[in-house]
A protein has these predicted regions:
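An alpha-helical, amphipathic repeat domain used for nucleic-acid recognition
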Residues: 1-207
Length: 207
């Protein structure tokens, strides 16, 4: 089979259409076509065509993963599940994840640290709830243990309560206690920590 034309595809994607023996045969990422050195009048065997298809699939899978990572760091499990939903095959997905690991773009330890730090800075919650969230992201328990064990529930509950307490009326202690307690419970804190935090906040806010 001989390449008789290589034409730019329609739309915003950087793809090219390859024609063999005068007929449209397949499309490729333009980057793949350049890297493989495709030229008009070049002869392609069936095995070469299949190899090009595999390379194109991998490249599209890689681009999808990098785009997904552009919003925030992701766990390995999140990336794998996302690519599976996009319909990429298992071989390409595993090859892409391996490449991203080599480049330092996928690292579950770094991701878990990011997640914990982000939560503690902007939306403090309990060690238990942080652990649950990371487990839902597919992070391994041994990594979770290393990262989450440093979370101090008493400190996190106090910081979580600071902004909430200021929005609560101080004329009714029972209402203050109930509303702040419910708020901290939703953040995953236990009974003892909640009671201690409510007592501390009531003293500070009602001075």
């Amino acid at each position: 089979m001989r390449i008789t034309a290589i034409r730019g595809g329609r739309g915003r994607g950087k793809r090219v259409n390859v024609f063999l023996d005068g007929k449209f045969a397949f499309s490729l990422e333009a980057e793949v076509a350049v890297r493989e050195g495709l030229q008009v009048d070049q002869e392609l065997s069936a095995s070469q065509t299949e190899a090009l298809a595999r390379s194109d699939h991998f490249h599209r899978c890689l681009n999808a993963a990098v785009y997904y990572l552009s919003y925030r760091p992701r766990s390995e499990s999140e990336i794998r599940e996302r690519l599976q939903r996009r319909g990429f095959n298992g071989d390409s997905i595993e090859a892409v994840i391996a490449k991203l690991k080599e480049q330092g773009l996928v690292d579950d330890m770094a991701f878990a640290q990011f997640w914990k730090d982000n939560r503690q800075s902007f939306s403090p919650r309990s060690r238990w709830l942080t652990r649950l969230e990371l487990r839902q992201k597919g992070v391994a328990d041994d990594i979770i243990d290393q990262v989450v064990d440093a979370v101090d529930d008493a400190d996190s509950a106090y910081r979580a309560a600071l902004s909430k307490a200021r929005s609560l009326p101080l004329s009714d202690y029972q209402s203050f206690r109930r509303r702040l307690g419910d708020y901290l419970k939703r953040r995953g804190f236990g009974y003892e920590v909640i009671n201690q935090t409510i007592g501390r906040m009531w003293q500070e806010e009602s001075r």
